[in-house]
Amino acid sequence: MAQKLEAKGGEMGDVWDDGVYENVRKVYVGQAQYGIAFVKFEYVNGSQVVVGDEHGKKTELGVEEFEIDADDYIVYVEGYREKVNDMTSEMITFLSIKTFKGKTSHPIEKRPGVKFVLHGGKIVGFHGRSTDVLHSLGAYVSLSSTIKLLGKWIKVEQKGEGPGLRCSHGIAQVGNKIYSFGGEFTPNQPIDKHLYVFDLETRTWSISPATGDVPHLSCLGVRMVSVGSTLYVFGGRDASRQYNGFYSFDTTTNEWKLLTPVEEGPTPRSFHSMAADEENVYVFGGVSATARLNTLDSYNIVDKKWFHCSTPGDSLTARGGAGLEVVQGKVWVVYGFNGCEVDDVHYYDPVQDKWTQVETFGVRPSERSVFASAAIGKHIVIFGGEIAMDPLAHVGPGQLTDGTFALDTETLQWERLDKFGGEEETPSSRGWTASTTATIDGKKGLVMHGGKAPTNDRFDDLFFYGIDSA
């Protein structure tokens, strides 16, 4: 099933329509003196290649070819349209085509005329109008047949001596236990350096015994992930902006180890993002003593070495409070704060050591940072966050929001998951929460603890968005 996107441009010329196919394999664009003279597309249906008609007229200025790899597809077309010379109707003056994997036919740049875009999923056909030039262009977009994620929020009962009211901390799951470390109650004042452990069977918090290289700083803006039975903790700062190094905690022996002193590892920071796969721990962005960062570093737990990943392009600005998740071998950076809230999405391919920015669509969440996030199958699920900075910066609450959204990393489509006030246990607006991917009572989902309230108070609740189908 495909949706027909309206053709953008002028009304002059004959209408043409290539129809719908499985994929687009090649695009031919002919140049005219003032814009696009003609286009032609090659499509794929199964093993058959279908060569479309020429729309417009070739000139002596040549033809450019753009080939799409067999395992890739077009997700975004950007163009400009304008009335040229004495034309009574607009023509297309510029086209740039971008694929899911980030391949582009031309650098996307501002041009004279009116900008238009065609996107919304996998593009599987084109239509438009033409005379001796291309006057308009539209597209067909394949609609995903993926079933919407079905789930609901529950408030998890808590007993025992837990983290209590706090924000800016980190949590991670190992087996049937959730661990919490760091955080603040009063702005910029870390609370303690206990490692709290929540038993999912008894719903009871306790303070974990600790031996070895116990972190010497109580810290806020810290992040923590788990790989197997080991927790990894990086960064965070105290009230005087002294920073923590990189630690591991073996949950089977309750032993801390200082893996990398603060002066030997990646740039010390707070309010960064962390994620992990089976062999690597990733650290992205955050705020150092002097600036925000946009670097990605990975630590291989087998080799016990840091690797500084390739530098992203200018479009991935330095930021804190971003979502960072590993999905199907790619490391995804979602939104964040670079002086203002942003809504761009990028992924890093560790095999190619390459960054790609993607264009998302659907029911997109507004710009935000310091939200809860989790990776569930091919989806990234987020909740809440800050949508506008407070005039007092971190001392104030900022403008905080709610809402549960999921990004399908294959189709690049966002959807809203929760109901609008329809569930009693839906969390209230908040940011600066601690969150992780978790499995509770056999369901995988997003678990989050605490956070900052719109009143600038702190939460101490524990919520879980469990997925029934994915």
Curated annotation (Swiss-Prot):
It catalyses: a (Z)-N-(sulfonatooxy)alkanimidothioate = a nitrile + sulfur + sulfate; (Z)-phenyl-N-(sulfonatooxy)methanimidothioate = phenylacetonitrile + sulfur + sulfate; (Z)-N-(sulfonatooxy)prop-2-enimidothioate = but-3-enenitrile + sulfur + sulfate; (Z)-4-methylsulfanylbutyl-N-(sulfonatooxy)methanimidothioate = 5-(methylsulfanyl)pentanenitrile + sulfur + sulfate + H(+). SMART domains: Jacalin (SM00915), Kelch (SM00612). Disruption phenotype: Reduced simple nitrile levels in favor of isothiocyanates in tissues corresponding to its main basal expression. Abnormal accumulation of glucosinolate in seeds, during stratification and germination. Kelch repeats lie at residues 177-225, 230-276, 280-329, 331-375, 379-434. Fe(2+) binds at E386, D390, H394. Residues 2-143 form the Jacalin-type lectin domain. Its EC number is 4.8.1.5. The active site is at R237, R292. Induction: By herbivory. Keywords: Iron, Kelch repeat, Lectin, Lyase, Repeat. If the presence of Fe(2+) is not required for the production of nitriles with benzylglucosinolate as substrate, Fe(2+) is mandatory with 2-propenylglucosinolate and enhances the global lyase activity in a dose-dependent manner. More active at pH 7.4 than at pH 6. A (Z)-N-(sulfonatooxy)alkanimidothioate binds at R237, S270, R292, G321, V370, W432. GO terms for molecular function: carbohydrate binding; lyase activity; mRNA binding. Specifier protein responsible for constitutive and herbivore-induced simple nitrile formation, especially in seedlings and roots. Promotes simple nitriles, but not epithionitrile or thiocyanate formation. Converts allylglucosinolate (allyl-GSL), 4-methylsulfinylbutylglucosinolate, 4-methylthiobutylglucosinolate, 2-propenylglucosinolate (sinigrin), indol-3-ylmethylglucosinolate (glucobrassicin), benzylisothiocyanate and benzylglucosinolate (glucotropaeolin) to their corresponding simple nitriles in the presence of myrosinase. Belongs to the jacalin lectin family. This is Thiohydroximate-O-sulfate sulfur/sulfate-lyase (nitrile-forming) NSP1.
